[in-house]
UniProtKB/Swiss-Prot annotation:
The keyword Acetylation does not apply. This is DNA repair protein RecO. It comes from the Bacteria. Keywords: DNA damage, DNA recombination, DNA repair. GO terms for cellular component: bacterial nucleoid. GO terms for biological process: DNA recombination; double-strand break repair. It holds the Pfam family RecO_N. InterPro entries: ARFGAP/RecO, DNA_rep/recomb_RecO_N, NA-bd_OB-fold, RecO, RecO_C.
Length: 240
């Protein structure tokens, strides 16, 4: 199959043999595509190597043969965000999450839109943690894994003053008061869930619980195997 003039975001790149690269690209029309870029070393290939970098939006043509497509041509369509520190790790995270969750050769246009929006947010003044929670919410929705952010698992309106445990299958499970002390780290406030559903940034005190709860849901859909970027973020937090 010939893929011509397709737009895509570079999610991940690694060396293959001495002069080639294996590149994972997220496209709107073809889903996640694995590309084999042969012979990209040398001064005459500098522009191509520069285009095949994570976060870069490219236009490419390739021939699909089996699992990998043979790259014929690629060019950068813009300048990827220049990131450092926490935002650089966040860029690694959004790419790794979609690398694991986006199906190969199965287009999910919503995931393409999610990545494009998250990429813009990384280069903006939007609070980083809030941008990532919105990204996670939208990825789950795009994959058909969204849960109700207005009602709990029993169909009752979410109480902003209560705490909930997010279950990947059942959604928000209200935590009984007698269990609250032992479950506090594993729960999120109703106020944070309502805010997430309304696309309004929760209070700063509610953000850690929302992060942990969303991570638990994502971990389920990742098959119980976490992300390297999570380990890197936790290691960075311990050093601070």
């Amino acid at each position: 199959m010939l893929i011509e003039h397709e737009r895509g975001f570079v999610l991940h790149v690694r060396a293959w043999r001495e002069t080639s690269l294996l590149v994972e690209v997220l496209t709107e029309q073809h889903g996640r595509v694995g590309l084999l870029a042969r012979g990209v070393q040398g001064p005459r290939k500098q522009a191509l190597r520069a285009a095949l970098q994570p976060l870069q939006l490219i236009q490419f043509s390739a021939v699909q043969r089996g699992e990998l497509a043979q790259l014929r041509q690629a060019e950068a369509l813009d300048t990827a965000p220049r990131l450092a520190g926490d935002t650089m790790l966040a860029g690694f995270y959004i790419g790794e999450l979609l690398l694991r969750l986006a199906p190969r050769h199965d287009p999910v246009p919503e995931l393409y839109a999610c990545y494009a929006q998250a990429r813009r947010h990384l280069a903006s003044d939007l609070p980083l943690a809030w941008g990532l929670r919105r990204f996670e919410r939208d990825v789950l929705e795009g994959l058909g894994f969204a849960f109700d952010l207005q009602h709990d698992s029993e169909g009752q309106p979410i109480d902003p003053a209560a705490r909930y445990r997010l279950d990947p299958q059942d959604g928000a499970l209200r935590v009984l008061s007698e269990r609250l002390a032992q479950d506090r780290r594993e729960t999120v406030t109703g106020a944070a869930l309502l805010a997430l559903g309304q696309d309004v940034m929760p209070d700063a005190d509610d953000m850690p619980g929302l992060r942990r709860s969303m991570r638990g849901v994502l971990l389920h859909h990742l098959g119980g195997r976490g992300l390297k970027s999570w380990e890197m973020l936790e290691d960075l937090a311990r050093r601070r």
